[in-house]
C-alpha cells in the first residue's frame, strides 16, 4: 500500500482507484485481521503525565471491543443507535470506538470540554441511547439525563456512580464471543457535531466506507508502515483523531503513541519525542507554533522521520524553523470533518512551504467559480471536490436532519468545502481563507492567512489572528490580534514596527491598519483559531 520513496506523484495519483466493497466494518476487516496475523502485534503505547505506562496489542483491542459490544447490546444498544463517547486520551476510548463500529452502532465522539447544555443538545439531536464517559464528566450527564428521553445506558470507565455501569466490570462479566456484523459500506457509522458560522452544531454523518478513505491518509500522508510509532497530538473529540489516531495508523498496522495529560506543554512534548521511539508525528499548527518557541537545539530528534500538520495552514516561517532544527519538513494536509484527506504534501512529492500540496489520490479537487466552472491557474475561487462519475470515499453522507445546509454544500457536480484558494502553475494549492473570513477592504480581497504568515516572521509575534474591522472610509479594514512572544511588550512603537514589517513582506495594501495585543487567541478544541469570535467582537462593538 505504501509508496516507494522514488515514486512520483503522478505515478500514484493517475492510476488510483478506490476500493468499493459492498460491505465493510473496520473492526472486523482491519483490527481483527491484524490481531489474527500476529497476536502480539502492538496497537497502542500509552503514557500519562505521571509516568504511568500501558500498552495494548491488536488482540487486546479486538478482544476488549467484542466484550464491550456484547455488554452494550445486552444493555439495550441496538444496531444504528448513536453512542456518545466523551473521554480524553484514556486508552478505553480506542476500545469503545472499535466496539461501537463492530456492533453496527454509530459513534459520536465529543470533547470533555462540553458543558451539560452541550451534551443535552447532542443527545436530543442525535437521539442517542448511550453515553460512555469518565467520573469527572458523569455529573454533567446526570444533570441533564431526565431531559434526554432516548438515553438508556450510561457507562463509566472509572469510579462508581449510581445508575452507571462500570467499564472494568463489563470486561470481566461479558464474553469476547461476538458475531461478525456484516455492516453495509453505506451504513451509518459516525456522527460528528461540527460548528458552523450560524445556528447549532451540524450533525455530520459518515458511513462505514469512510474508513476506506484513510487508505490514502495512512500510507501516503502520514507515511506509515507496520513498524512505526505514530503520535497524533489531538483531542479525541475532534475528527482529526479519527484520521490520525485511529483509521489512518491502524489501516497500516502502525502503533499509536498516546500521551494523556491535563494540558499541552511544549517542553514536555519535545522531551517525549526525545525519550520514546516516536517515528512520525501529526499536530495542529498551534502545536508547532508553540514548539518552535522552545530552544529546539536542546533536543534529540534522530528517531523522528516524518511530520505533518493539519487543521489550518501552517505558516512558512514555522515550517522553516522546524526544518532547521530537526531536518524535517512539516507536510501540510487539508481535509475537513466532512471528508478524508483532500489535498496534501505527500511523502512522494516535493513540498512547497506554506502550500496545501496537491490533490489526494482518488480526489478530483479543483478551484471553481460561482457558476461551478473550473478557473484558470493562479485565480482565487472555491475549493471543490468533483462528485461524478462517483463520489470519492470519505465524503460525508449528510448533515442529519438538515437538508438545507446539506444542499448548500453542493454546486452542480461539486461538493463545496467553504474554503477559498488558488492553484499555481505546478498544481499546488494555496489556501486563502474560509469563504466567510475573506476581508474586503477598499475593493481589495485580503485573506487572513497571508497577513498572519507575514506577521509571524517577526520575532515579537508568537501567534496572530487577522479579521475584518469596520471602517467609515474603506468599509472594512484588516485588524490583527497579536499574542506576543516572551520578552516583548505591546506598545505604539511595536505596532508601527509590525505594520511596516507586513508592508515589506507582502503587498502593502494587506497591512493591518488596526492592531490589538492580547494574551491568548480564542480557539476550538482542535486548536483552530476562532476568527469568527474576534470578527463578531469587532462588528458588534
Language-model features: where?
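Conserved pre-ATP/AMP-binding loop-to-beta segment of ANL
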Residues: 39-42, 156, 162, 172-193, ...
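Conserved AMP-binding/adenylate-forming core of the ANL superfamily
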Residues: 40, 44-98, 115-120, 166-172, ...
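Conserved AMP-binding A3 loop
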Residues: 54-59, 189-213
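Structural core segment of the AMP-binding/adenylate-forming
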Residues: 74-75, 98, 102-169, 183, ...
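AMP-binding/adenylate-forming catalytic core of the ANL superfamily
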Residues: 114, 121, 129-134, 281, ...
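Gly/Ser/Thr-rich phosphate-binding loop
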Residues: 192, 251, 278-283, 292-352, ...
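Conserved AMP-binding/adenylation subdomain of ANL enzymes
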Residues: 212-232, 236-279, 294
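Conserved ATP/PPi-binding loop(s) of AMP-dependent carboxylate-activating enzymes
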Residues: 362, 373-408, 446
Amino acid at each position: 500500500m505504501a509508496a516507494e520513496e522514488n515514486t512520483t506523484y503522478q505515478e500514484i495519483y493517475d492510476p488510483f482507484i478506490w476500493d468499493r466493497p459492498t460491505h465493510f466494518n473496520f473492526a472486523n476487516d482491519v483490527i481483527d485481521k491484524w490481531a489474527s496475523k500476529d497476536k502480539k502485534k502492538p496497537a497502542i503505547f500509552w503514557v500519562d503525565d505521571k509516568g504511568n505506562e500501558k500498552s495494548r496489542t491488536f488482540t487486546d483491542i479486538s478482544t476488549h471491543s467484542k466484550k464491550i459490544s456484547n455488554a452494550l447490546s445486552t444493555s439495550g444498544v441496538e444496531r444504528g443507535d448513536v453512542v456518545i463517547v466523551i473521554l480524553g486520551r484514556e486508552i478505553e476510548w480506542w476500545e469503545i470506538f472499535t466496539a461501537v463500529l463492530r456492533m453496527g452502532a454509530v459513534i459520536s465522539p465529543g470533547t470533555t470540554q462540553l458543558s451539560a447544555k452541550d451534551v443535552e443538545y447532542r443527545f436530543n439531536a442525535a437521539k442517542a441511547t448511550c453515553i460512555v464517559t469518565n467520573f469527572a464528566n458523569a455529573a454533567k450527564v446526570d444533570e441533564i439525563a431526565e431531559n434526554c428521553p432516548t438515553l438508556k445506558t450510561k457507562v463509566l470507565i472509572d469510579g462508581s456512580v449510581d445508575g452507571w455501569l462500570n467499564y472494568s466490570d463489563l470486561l470481566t462479566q461479558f464474553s469476547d464471543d461476538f458475531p461478525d456484523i456484516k455492516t453495509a459500506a453505506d451504513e451509518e457509522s459516525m456522527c460528528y457535531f461540527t460548528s458552523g458560522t450560524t445556528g447549532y452544531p451540524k450533525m455530520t454523518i459518515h458511513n462505514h466506507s469512510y474508513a476506506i478513505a484513510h487508505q490514502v491518509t495512512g500510507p501516503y500522508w502520514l507515511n506509515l508502515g507496520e513498524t512505526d510509532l505514530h503520535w497524533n497530538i489531538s483531542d479525541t473529540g475532534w475528527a482529526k483523531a479519527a484520521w490520525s489516531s485511529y483509521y489512518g495508523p491502524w489501516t497500516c498496522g502502525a502503533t499509536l503513541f498516546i500521551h494523556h495529560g491535563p494540558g499541552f506543554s511544549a517542553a514536555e512534548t519535545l522531551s517525549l519525542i526525545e525519550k520514546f521511539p516516536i517515528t512520525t508525528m501529526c499536530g495542529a499548527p498551534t502545536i508547532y507554533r508553540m514548539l518552535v518557541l522552545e530552544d529546539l537545539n536542546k533536543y534529540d530528534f534522530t528517531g523522528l522521520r516524518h511530520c505533518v500538520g493539519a487543521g489550518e495552514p501552517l505558516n512558512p516561517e514555522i515550517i522553516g524553523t522546524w526544518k532547521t532544527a530537526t531536518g524535517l519538513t512539516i507536510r501540510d494536509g487539508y481535509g475537513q470533518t466532512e471528508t478524508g484527506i483532500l489535498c496534501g504534501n505527500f511523502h512522494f512529492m516535493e513540498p512547497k512551504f506554506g502550500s496545501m500540496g496537491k490533490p489526494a489520490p482518488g480526489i478530483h479537487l479543483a478551484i471553481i467559480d460561482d457558476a461551478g466552472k473550473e478557473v484558470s491557474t493562479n485565480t482565487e475561487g472555491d475549493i471543490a471536490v468533483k462528485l461524478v462519475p462517483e463520489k470519492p470515499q470519505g465524503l460525508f453522507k449528510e448533515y442529519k436532519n438538515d437538508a438545507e445546509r446539506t444542499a448548500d454544500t453542493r454546486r452542480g457536480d461539486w461538493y463545496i468545502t467553504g474554503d477559498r484558494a488558488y492553484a499555481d502553475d505546478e498544481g499546488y494549492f494555496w489556501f486563502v481563507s474560509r469563504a466567510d473570513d475573506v476581508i474586503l477592504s477598499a475593493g481589495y480581497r485580503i485573506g487572513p492567512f497571508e497577513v498572519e504568515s507575514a506577521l509571524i516572521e517577526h520575532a515579537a509575534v508568537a501567534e496572530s489572528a487577522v479579521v475584518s474591522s469596520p471602517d467609515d472610509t474603506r468599509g472594512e479594514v484588516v485588524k490583527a490580534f497579536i499574542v506576543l512572544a516572551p520578552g516583548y511588550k505591546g506598545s505604539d512603537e511595536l505596532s508601527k514596527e509590525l505594520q511596516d514589517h507586513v508592508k515589506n513582506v507582502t503587498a502593502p495594501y494587506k497591512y493591518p491598519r488596526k492592531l490589538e495585543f492580547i494574551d491568548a487567541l480564542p480557539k476550538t478544541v482542535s486548536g483552530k483559531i476562532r476568527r469568527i469570535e474576534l470578527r463578531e467582537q469587532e462588528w458588534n462593538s
